[in-house]
């Protein structure tokens, strides 16, 4: 063969001896023919391989085995589909879902499995799991169509949607906003917004300087800043945008919009509130007072002060934007610049003034063609008005409806007859007919409120919604209980009074959702995520009669009991939370000592507490004998008895002397008191009973004895019973007449054992 005839590189190389030595050394590990040169012993990354080819052959076997075990895992499940997949087809849906779950698990634990220089996520050690807001049910939800039916039930929170649902926007009148008249959830383009108006119960403050904002600007995420402060903050970043210091959303300078924050009154329980009757046409998203209602084809203009608070969008011309938006910001910036001219913030105030001037110039240049078109239209309108002037005069002369009803009105009145002579005979008849119609028509309708809307304007009620809203324009609406009372009194909401003033009984806050829309149809004009309140007021006789209130007394009282129960539960919950927080801080409740316990704390006073008939039957149990001597106890007892019983003399009340005790001998009186009878102890230890709920507003009541006191008293009574000597039976007499000796008990012995 040609290879055998040629010499090997090892033979030709002068250093072949060294190579042979290396081959001989490696012969113990494996055959010499399998060894590779140095160039072949390096892998693709340049690192040397530590093992030879024979050692490397074992790895593919393990990989195939591991692959087989991994592939065989799905086959063990009962739901595994054994049908082979089609050629060129996609994966099965079940396997794809399983792979997605495995991928998420692998992504969750990958940071903990593989160590490296980067930070390691150790959330799995804390058993920390969370679900996305969009899919709370997970893939194993019971109903697969839940998300499609309730598209807003699990919708994630959107800051821009919340901002546009709870604010009022001043927009330019150049654009078309007809879409916002049909869908309340349609977002207004942020580029069309000239000013944002926020109605809040608190005064807004800049989170950077902590002062009321000057020439305030609002971001798309809904946070308000001073214009110089936010310019200073944006200048610190090297990029064109920066993170919001509150919520870390992106802030761009061109997205900053002018904002005006208006403080509104926060209604609470006990306040007086005035509710106004509102009217809204079905299909229209603007509700107005019934007395000021008008047909709308476009959003309300900024100059309409009567309806400006009831619309979400306000149309403004370029002149109104210059006068009401730019001029006010310019005045505030100049005032701040004069006050802080020597401070480092002056440069940012100058930058804000320059941007404000650029905005005014761009607005004027954009409005020039519109001004020219408006002047041309005004000229054409004036020319048409001058041409049609005689025609309009003729039309005004022709349209006289007074002569069409009665021919007698055209005739001149007679001067001889006075106008008061003919009406008197007709007035009583007219009044009687009017009274009959009123009494025949109104009274049955008040007794039957359902029939009243049917008789009067059935079509009008089907095209309009009537409801009560706060007079200042806040989203505060009347409770259904009050609405039913008014409907029963007046027949329908359309005939209810224009305004009602009453005291607030309860305020419930809500957020608009699809479910709330289906429940309250009259609030369909509110966008999703809009916050509103339902207010229950105390209606009185001026607005509702006493007879109507009696019909709804049961329902009103039921709601009152529910409120009281809710308040009690809230109070108990606050107490539990307070105790838990104090326990975390090492503060524990103080020990409760029952001072009404006469066994532990006997009362000695001059006023009689008990009438003692005999000393033997009624005895006070004094303090524990460990803390006082028997003589002191006897003296105190005698003193107490003397104060309680007037038959005691002064000599008997004194303590016996030592000589008297010696003379008395065995007949000495008992110095240790006896235990009091059970009924006396029970009478002295009866505490005041608490109410059923364990709660009482009266703070001066006697508290309920704790378990510690009752248990200690029971133990003390048991020990006192054991201490009292039981009556000994009569001693048995023997036949011989001798008494039986009492068996003596050996206490201790003094005998000594002697050892040898």
Swiss-Prot record:
Coiled coil (residue ranges): none
Region (Disordered): 1-100, 682-702, 725-756
GO molecular function: transcription cis-regulatory region binding; ubiquitin protein ligase activity; zinc ion binding
Organism per entry: Xenopus laevis (African clawed frog)
Enzyme Commission (EC) number: 2.3.2.27
Protein's UniProt name: E3 ubiquitin-protein ligase RNF10
Main location: cytoplasm
UniProt-listed SMART domains: RING
Zinc finger (RING-type): 206-248
